[in-house]
């Protein structure tokens, strides 16, 4: 997704606290729903052979490593910082109120909205970097265990996608193409191979 780099990232929009939280977490999974699994491709577990083949997943017995993690404390702190910023600005500056403080927001065109988007892009990029480091560490272990190179083992990334992001996208709405800010909380965009 986004070739591993969200455009629009601006480190100046990220607090020192967020940076400090992320410094020693690069290359780590975290807890909760984050995981790393070593899986075996079974012929009876492939539901769409054409699609699986497009991703290079076609050999029964093929070993696949799947993992899920993000930007860790860095992204969490970015969200926390801007949630508080939005809560302060909403009533007076934007005339907005929400029933749940977790829904705090700011207009995208506002300084607060633009700063949040720039910081969120930094968090998305941190998540790409984190997963890249984890992938490298997994590859090193496989190479050491099997005594073969990455190329000999056929190790490669199949798919990398972020969740909990907002992206500027073009979509058709009421017969007209429009640029929209699409927020996906705990969800990802389904992109073709």
Write out the residue ranges for each language-model feature.
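Domain-length cofactor-binding catalytic modules of enzymes
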Residues: 1-193
């Amino acid at each position: 997704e986004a070739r591993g780099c969200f455009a629009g990232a601006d480190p100046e929009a990220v607090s020192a606290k967020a940076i400090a939280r992320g410094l020693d977490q690069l290359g780590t999974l975290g807890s909760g729903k984050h995981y790393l699994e070593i899986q075996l491709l079974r012929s009876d577990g492939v539901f769409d052979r054409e699609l699986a083949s497009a991703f290079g997943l076609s050999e029964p017995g093929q070993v696949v490593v799947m993992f899920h993690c993000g930007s860790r404390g860095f992204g969490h702190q970015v969200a926390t910082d801007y949630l508080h910023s939005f809560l302060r600005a909403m009533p007076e500056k934007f005339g907005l109120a929400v029933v749940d403080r977790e829904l705090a927001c700011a207009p995208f065109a506002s300084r607060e909205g633009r700063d949040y988007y720039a910081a969120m892009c930094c968090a998305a990029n941190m998540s790409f970097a984190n997963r890249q480091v984890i992938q490298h560490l997994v590859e090193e272990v496989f190479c050491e265990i099997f005594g073969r190179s990455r190329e000999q083992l056929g190790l490669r990334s199949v798919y990398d996608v972020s969740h909990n992001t907002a992206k500027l996208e073009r979509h058709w709405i009421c017969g007209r193409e429009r640029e929209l800010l699409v927020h996906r909380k705990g969800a990802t965009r389904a992109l073709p191979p």
